[in-house]
Amino acid sequence: MTPDDAFYLEERYVRRPRSRRLLPLFYRAKRFIPRRTQMHLRRTMARRQRGRHEAQGRFPRWPIEPLLVHQREILLHQRLLRAEGRRIPLLGAWPRGHRFAWTLTHDVEGPKGLANVERLLEIERRHGVVSAWYFVAEDYAIDPAVLEVVRAAGCEVGLHGLHHNGQLFQSRTHFERQLPRIRRYLREWGAEGFRSPSTHRNAAWMPELGARYDSSFPDTHPFDAQPGGCCSILPYFLGDLVELPITLPQDHTLFELLQERDISLWQEKAGWIARHGGLITVLVHPDYAIEDERLDHYEQLLAFLCALKGGWHALPRDVARWWRVRAALETQLGDAPPDATALARAGAARWFAAERDGEIVIETEEHAHA
């Protein structure tokens, strides 16, 4: 991570002092406002925010912020100029020659979501896919049998905080008070992953959670109580913590706030990420995916993702483990060109960058020799 990258990956560009003071007030007031009124206010605000983003090109753009992708392409272009027309070997982003990766995640916010776990698992079984489930540890009773059902389906159990109240990062004292219990639940559940309630985040503190990876940073998200985004469609490190950005708009954002009627925006964004070799991270809440229409949206998305060629479907914990392996390989290689045989032993692959008709083209090893 370069200092320039960190400015975006850690959201240093976001001015947050005022919003941090207001977040606890927002969550306290929320309890006394009828849900219908809440949703009306949030939908009105989301429509206005969307309009301003589209009209003014506000940063980060939504649903696609291409800044770091473009920066990566500029660096590649400079290397290609120095190579004088020769293609450049690269360490591939994904194992075994896959061109992109995709992973499925669910935040279980309350009892309704807990009761809906099996319905979403059944949809996933039909498509032969697996997912990660993040549970709130102390807001609702969690039958250990539910965690076993998730694990038996080949899925992953993660932690979604202690309470879904937006207060984890309200102060350093409060954060430190919760750390021992957060770490205990991670150990007891055998969980490697954490996602902060309401995706509230603090890049400086999150490495202390005790998780192997976090998935709380959206790449771009102007519609929440903590707007912003890391602008990345690739994993990255916060200290020793692997960050897996949420790169598709949440189902709640699309269908609850913006009241979209189909999955075309999901498809557009997923296709763009795949073309640029990124990580497609899906977040669907079982608390909201209850009606047949919402379940059908999820089924359509799975069919679309399964049909994309060249993708690596994996659990988030496996993506995070791979990113550690890849980082170690990158350190070992230094400036040396990657050797295909050595990479293959580590499950990695070599990519090639070339410039054709003024555009940068990335090819996997097999396509480069085809």
Which sequence ranges carry the predicted segments?
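Terminal accessory/targeting
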Residues: 1-134, 139-142, 187-188, 207-210, ...
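Conserved beta-strand positions
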Residues: 159, 196, 282-284
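Metal-dependent catalytic neighborhoods of phosphoester/phosphodiester hydrolases
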Residues: 145-146, 169-176, 205-207
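Glycine-rich phosphate-binding "P-loop"
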Residues: 104-109, 157-173
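Short, solvent-exposed turn/loop segments enriched in Gly/Ser/Thr/Pro and often Arg
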Residues: 135-143, 192-202, 218-221
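Acidic, His- and aromatic-enriched active-site or binding-groove loops in soluble protein domains
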Residues: 154-164, 211-227, 235-237
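Active-site-proximal binding-pocket segments
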Residues: 167, 186, 195-198, 202-205, ...
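An active-site-proximal "capping" alpha-helix that borders the catalytic cofactor pocket
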Residues: 175-189
